[in-house]
Swiss-Prot record:
It comes from Xanthomonas euvesicatoria pv. vesicatoria (strain 85-10) (Xanthomonas campestris pv. vesicatoria). The keyword DNA damage applies. Keywords: DNA damage, DNA recombination, DNA repair. GO terms for cellular component: bacterial nucleoid. GO terms for biological process: DNA recombination; double-strand break repair. Involved in DNA repair and RecF pathway recombination. It comes from the Bacteria. Pfam families: RecO_C, RecO_N. The gene is recO. InterPro entries: ARFGAP/RecO, DNA_rep/recomb_RecO_N, NA-bd_OB-fold, RecO, RecO_C. HAMAP family: RecO. This is DNA repair protein RecO. Belongs to the RecO family.
Length: 240
């Protein structure tokens, strides 16, 4: 199959043999595509190597043969955001999450839109944690894994003052008592869930619980195997 003039975001790149690269690209029309870029070394290939970097929006043509497509041509369509510190790790995170969750060669246009929006958000001065929670919510929605952010698992309206445990299958389970500190760590306030559903940033005190709860849901859909970027973010937080 010939893929011509397709737009996509570079999610991941690694060296293959001495002069080639294996590139994972998220596209709107073909889903996540694996590319084999041969012979990218040398001064004449400098522009191509620069284009094949994570977070970069490219236009490419390739021939699909089996699992990997043979890259014929690629060029950068813009300048990828220059991220540093926490935002750089966040960029790694959004790419790794879609590398793991986006289906190969199966288009999910909503995921392409999620990535484009998150990429723009990371380049802004807006609150980073809130941008990532919105991204996670939209990714789950795009994959058909969204849960009700207005009602709990019993169909009752979510109570802003109550706490809930997020179940990947059943949604928000109301917690009637919290006997241990660990119980509280594993729950999220109803106010935070309602805010997420209304696309309004929750109170700062509610953000850690929302992060942990969303991570638990994502971990389920990742097959129980976490992300490298999660560990990197935790290591960074411990060093501060």
């Amino acid at each position: 199959m010939l893929i011509e003039h397709e737009r996509g975001f570079v999610l991941h790149v690694r060296a293959w043999r001495e002069t080639s690269l294996l590139v994972e690209v998220l596209t709107e029309q073909h889903g996540r595509v694996g590319l084999l870029a041969r012979g990218v070394q040398g001064p004449r290939k400098q522009a191509l190597r620069a284009a094949l970097q994570p977070l970069q929006l490219i236009q490419f043509s390739a021939v699909q043969r089996g699992e990997l497509a043979q890259l014929r041509q690629a060029e950068a369509l813009d300048t990828a955001p220059r991220l540093v510190g926490d935002t750089m790790l966040a960029g790694f995170y959004i790419s790794e999450l879609l590398l793991r969750l986006a289906p190969r060669n199966d288009p999910v246009p909503e995921l392409y839109a999620c990535y484009a929006q998150a990429r723009t958000y990371l380049a802004s001065d807006l609150p980073l944690a809130w941008g990532l929670r919105r991204f996670e919510r939209d990714v789950l929605d795009g994959l058909g894994f969204a849960f009700d952010l207005q009602h709990d698992s019993d169909g009752q309206p979510i109570d802003p003052a109550a706490r809930y445990r997020l179940d990947p299958q059943e949604g928000a389970l109301r917690v009637l008592s919290e006997r241990l500190a660990q119980d509280r760590r594993e729950t999220v306030t109803g106010a935070a869930l309602l805010a997420l559903g209304e696309d309004v940033m929750p109170d700062a005190d509610d953000m850690p619980g929302l992060r942990r709860s969303m991570r638990g849901v994502l971990l389920h859909h990742l097959g129980g195997r976490g992300l490298k970027s999660w560990q990197m973010l935790e290591d960074l937080a411990r060093r501060r």
